[in-house]
Amino acid sequence: MSCTLLKGVCTMKFLMMIVFLQVSACGAAPMNDSEFAEWYLSRFYDYGKDRIPMTKTKTNRNFLKEKLQEMQQFFGLEATGQLDNSTLAIMHIPRCGVPDVQHLRAVPQRSRWMKRYLTYRIYNYTPDMKREDVDYIFQKAFQVWSDVTPLRFRKLHKDEADIMILFAFGAHGDFNYFDGKGGTLAHAFYPGPGIQGDAHFDEAETWTKSFQGTNLFLVAVHELGHSLGLQHSNNPKSIMYPTYRYLNPSTFRLSADDIRNIQSLYGAPVKPPSLTKPSSPPSTFCHQSLSFDAVTTVGEKIFFFKDWFFWWKLPGSPATNITSISSIWPSIPSGIQAAYEIESRNQLFLFKDEKYWLINNLVPEPHYPRSIYSLGFSASVKKVDAAVFDPLRQKVYFFVDKHYWRYDVRQELMDPAYPKLISTHFPGIKPKIDAVLYFKRHYYIFQGAYQLEYDPLFRRVTKTLKSTSWFGC
């Protein structure tokens, strides 16, 4: 019998064992303080009455006291070896299910992935939150680690990924059962094949994106740290500290220790190409008939593509810079026909004819270009005239001749019932469109030497401008 819940194969006998474990765990009698402390030390500090020493040693050692001292030292408590109130209080704080001390025979030292490009898949979703919120939270959690390393992550919607993400109750097939609300919140496995690298979250918790309940983003960043090879830290400022505490996700930053530890495994991020070398624009800079092939934001800048080069500038700045496409991205061809950015992911997509390229943090991704037909276009489409990403709707609009297509970024699928006529659904806009820019909740639709400022909320054109107005011409 195949098992799709976890990587690998499980038998009926194994499933029955899982059920038995879950019933046993749920039906266990409440523990007193001493029993709870022994359970805690057994689970997180490798304590066990039947532990066989790896080396010859005295048989009258007090292993329980030694493990209590080890736990107290880890959390910065006075290492008395006594089960006092401060020690018990720490033990009762909700925490990660990964041990603080790894047994020498159980975990390879400095486990890491031996590749830069990793895949992940959210196997199922918690009912506590909207599906799109869960997708966004994990995308941001992975970005926390990709921002400080050369690692890159890609989401899969089917098949087995390097990192499988699962929400589950109680016993769920890995002999590391969840204990209900509070207690252990989640656990993850160090890098490797099979279940290694996976992250599991206790569905008994109330997962949220705020300070109420348990904040999914904070726990996800922590567990993905394990999935990438990090162990627990005894630094309370580290996201890899074992116990849970709320931090504001909008201002969250990795500690210096976290950055140093993850970079000791994977190195620093690949330095993006420099865009700080301005040069004088050509004489056609403010030509009255100047048009653009593609226009998009790239971070805080705006890129204006034309033939083999592009202008770039900061909105509001008098300076305008120009450089050749090949000087920044030697693998990208000239004559880009459409472009859009997903700023939250630091991703730039470039289109020419039947192919498209992905630029991640200004670095071209391998295994590109890809076919535009993989996005869901029909065979009749031979090129994309213009494209724009609307962050409020999380949709990409592709303009092709008299029609437009709409692509769902979260689902990574073309929306059904498309294409539709541009003139019908964008009143005041007539084909053909050269480029589209999203800026301050408006679309700027470039057609030859002019651009139309379009309000997508009220579906109307609000201004007509020269295409070169961005340059102060």
From Swiss-Prot:
Keyword Hydrolase: yes
Prodomain positions: 29-109
Glycan attachment residues as annotated in the record: 32, 85, 321
Cofactor requirements of the protein: Ca(2+); Zn(2+)
Positions of Ca(2+) 1 binding: 128, 203, 205
Binding-site residues for Zn(2+) 2, renumbered to this chain: 96, 222, 226, 232
Cofactor binding note: Binds 4 Ca(2+) ions per subunit.
Active site: 223
Claim: Transport is one of the keywords in the record: no
Disulfide-linked positions: 286-473
GO biological process per UniProt: bronchiole development; cellular response to virus; elastin catabolic process; lung alveolus development; negative regulation of endothelial cell-matrix adhesion via fibronectin; negative regulation of transcription by RNA polymerase II; negative regulation of type I interferon-mediated signaling pathway; positive regulation of epithelial cell proliferation involved in wound healing
Reactions mediated catalytically: Hydrolysis of soluble and insoluble elastin. Specific cleavages are also produced at 14-Ala-|-Leu-15 and 16-Tyr-|-Leu-17 in the B chain of insulin
Hemopexin repeat ranges per the UniProt record: 289-332, 333-379, 381-429, 430-473
GO annotations of cellular component type: cytoplasm; extracellular matrix; extracellular region; extracellular space; nucleus
Compartments, record wording: Secreted, Extracellular space, Extracellular matrix
Annotated residues for binding of Zn(2+) 1: 172, 174, 187, 200
Binding-site list for Ca(2+) 4: 293, 385, 434
Role, per record: May be involved in tissue injury and remodeling. Has significant elastolytic activity. Can accept large and small amino acids at the P1' site, but has a preference for leucine. Aromatic or hydrophobic residues are preferred at the P1 site, with small hydrophobic residues (preferably alanine) occupying P3.
PANTHER family: MACROPHAGE METALLOELASTASE, MATRIX METALLOPROTEINASE
Assigned protein family: Belongs to the peptidase M10A family.
Name the record gives this protein: Macrophage metalloelastase
